[in-house]
Amino acid sequence: HLRTRRQRQMCIRDRGEPRLTAALNYVADAGEAESSAKGMFTAESKGNTTAQLGYGTKKWGAALGYRYGQCGAGFGTAYKAVKQSCGGGNVDSQNFALNGFWKPEETGFIPSVSLAYGWSDLEGSTVEEAQTWMVGLQWDKVANTPHSLAVGFGAPLYVESQDGTNPDAPELAWEASLKYKVSKNITLIPAIFYLPESNSSQGVSGKEQFGAVVQTVFKF
């Protein structure tokens, strides 16, 4: 019985100790192509090589990510100016991301904070640099209730510099949500969001958008 208690105490202490994690993966968008020039690990694989290193606890943490994208690999962005076709050149990209979060010891007026920043450097392209960033805040147990409030704002991946005149940076996009616990098994999550008018210098043009959504979660 004493040994079991000590093991439990050690386990509780270990949960608060910082942990180091690492991950590495490779995806080839053209991995199943019939041409022998494509496939995996070739110059025309449209490959993504991603590595990530993280360190932290349940209360705080940070992660550094790196991605090498070959010609034709997608960026996952709505801004057309960032998307570059292969053409006759060898376009590739070096991409870096830094993310972190922090939670207060006790819930209250001070929120938990999430931060993220990404930067891309393109070679063989008219676009030279692109970046993205976001800030997220969350208040748990608002006013001593089981509900939580979250707010986030930032900018999607956009062109920072290019050949010729650099485009204007997009305006802020934001969203807010309330996690409302109706009962032990039912939660309502109403949310609102705002997307600014698209910047024509970023390769797209469109009107601003304001919307709302309600999600219902059932647990059995």
Language-model segments: what does each one mean?
Residues H1-D14:
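Single conserved hydrophobic/aromatic residue that forms the stacking wall/gate
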Residues P18-L24, T49, K59-L64, C71-A73, ...:
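Repeated loop/turn-to-beta-strand initiation elements of outer-membrane beta-barrel proteins
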Residues A51-L53, L98-G100, V135-L137, A176, ...:
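Membrane-embedded beta-strands of outer-membrane beta-barrel proteins
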Residues R19, Y26-E32, T57-K59, Y66-G72, ...:
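Transmembrane beta-strands of outer-membrane beta-barrel pores
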Residues F96-A155:
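A beta-strand-loop signature enriched in Asp, Gly, Thr, and Trp
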Residues A30-L98:
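Surface-exposed beta-loop-beta
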Residues E208-F220:
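Outer-membrane beta-barrel "beta-signal"
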